[in-house]
Amino acid sequence: MSNDTQPTIAIIGYGSQGRAHALNLRDSGFDVTVGLRPGGPTEAKAQADGFTVVAPAEAVKTADLVAVLTPDMVQKKLYEEVIAPNMKQGACLLFAHGLNVHFDMIKPRADLDVVLVAPKGPGALVRREYEIGRGVPCIYAVYQDTSGKAEQFALTYAGGLGGARANIIKTTFKEETETDLFGEQAVLCGGASSLVQAGFEVLVEAGYQPEIAYYEVLHELKLIVDLFYEGGITRMLEFVSETAQYGDYVSGPRVIDASTKARMKDVLTDIQNGTFTKNWVAEYEAGLPNYTKFKQADLEHPIEEVGKKLRAKMVWLNGEQQAAATPAKQQAA
């Protein structure tokens, strides 16, 4: 490190997380450079935010800590062709997700410290909480400690993001990677979206209006999730009617039963043994044919057209939709 507490930092990537990390770290007093390919989609944004923007190969040459905040599937090539040949001896390589390292797609140089720092929230929230004097909890891990200071690198970085204002929990690359993938696939994204689509289909096929079905299985879900977020399942149960509580108790286990849990275990096994990652890499390298097909099927699901029409009448959503759309357009460095 340049000194005991303030490493010079290169942020590679300027999407949702990259921008939040760079801004928070700079406001915490760190010397931050942003590494982006010249003419890339986020170069102008980083420059407008006041950062020195250089090519990734240049950014990593003098940095004490290099944070790789690009999409998972571009990281291997980026590391092999740009980072590894140029990163200075004894520096720290940081990731926000352990996929590439845990599954040996990236094999870090032996002289480097290798750590993980993952805020448990989207980039916009990481930035917003920091600006109002709070923070988003962070988890961190050490994969390779060559200098003996790798853990301090991770804690210093997490603190610079504002994580110490909330909570910082130690994990491992294995645990972070496998639990993150499982949460996305079985519950947060795959599980929730499939449950909503199935509920919508059941009601519409039974003759109920699609608009009513949309409100009941998708729109009102936010109200429930907000209560989960604030105080767990028990808080949600405190704020719904006794009828809803009873329905939860007797019907929830009929929908999510032992067979569902067994299939969730199968999903976890595929994650743990590398099957999911192997398939995802093959899909990406083949040009995303199945990914494109699956995505189109979701876009064409009847709930999307119904929702689009109903949301157009919810004028209070306009600002939220614009804010939510921005990070999705900033995925590539």
Curated annotation (Swiss-Prot):
Disulfide bonds: none annotated. Keywords: Amino-acid biosynthesis, Branched-chain amino acid biosynthesis, Magnesium, Metal-binding, NADP, Oxidoreductase. This is Ketol-acid reductoisomerase (NADP(+)). Its cofactor is Mg(2+). Its EC number is 1.1.1.86. The keyword Amino-acid biosynthesis applies. Binds 2 magnesium ions per subunit. GO terms for molecular function: ketol-acid reductoisomerase activity; magnesium ion binding; NADP binding. It catalyses: (2R)-2,3-dihydroxy-3-methylbutanoate + NADP(+) = (2S)-2-acetolactate + NADPH + H(+); (2R,3R)-2,3-dihydroxy-3-methylpentanoate + NADP(+) = (S)-2-ethyl-2-hydroxy-3-oxobutanoate + NADPH + H(+). Residues 1-171 form the KARI N-terminal Rossmann domain. SUPFAM superfamilies: 6-phosphogluconate dehydrogenase C-terminal domain-like (SSF48179), NAD(P)-binding Rossmann-fold domains (SSF51735). Involved in the biosynthesis of branched-chain amino acids (BCAA). Catalyzes an alkyl-migration followed by a ketol-acid reduction of (S)-2-acetolactate (S2AL) to yield (R)-2,3-dihydroxy-isovalerate. In the isomerase reaction, S2AL is rearranged via a Mg-dependent methyl migration to produce 3-hydroxy-3-methyl-2-ketobutyrate (HMKB). In the reductase reaction, this 2-ketoacid undergoes a metal-dependent reduction by NADPH to yield (R)-2,3-dihydroxy-isovalerate. The active site is at 97. Signal peptide: none annotated. NADP(+) binds at residues 14-17, 37, 42, 72-75, 123. Mg(2+) 1 binds at residues 180, 184. Mg(2+) 2 binds at residues 180, 216, 220. It comes from Xanthomonas campestris pv. campestris (strain ATCC 33913 / DSM 3586 / NCPPB 528 / LMG 568 / P 25). Substrate binds at residue 241. The gene is ilvC. PANTHER family: KETOL-ACID REDUCTOISOMERASE, MITOCHONDRIAL. One of its GO terms (cellular component) is cytosol. Belongs to the ketol-acid reductoisomerase family. Pathway: Amino-acid biosynthesis; L-isoleucine biosynthesis; L-isoleucine from 2-oxobutanoate: step 2/4; Amino-acid biosynthesis; L-valine biosynthesis; L-valine from pyruvate: step 2/4. Residues 172-317 form the KARI C-terminal knotted domain. InterPro entries: 6-PGluconate_DH-like_C_sf (IPR008927), KARI (IPR013023), KARI_C (IPR000506), KARI_N (IPR013116), KARI_prok (IPR014359), NAD(P)-bd_dom_sf (IPR036291).
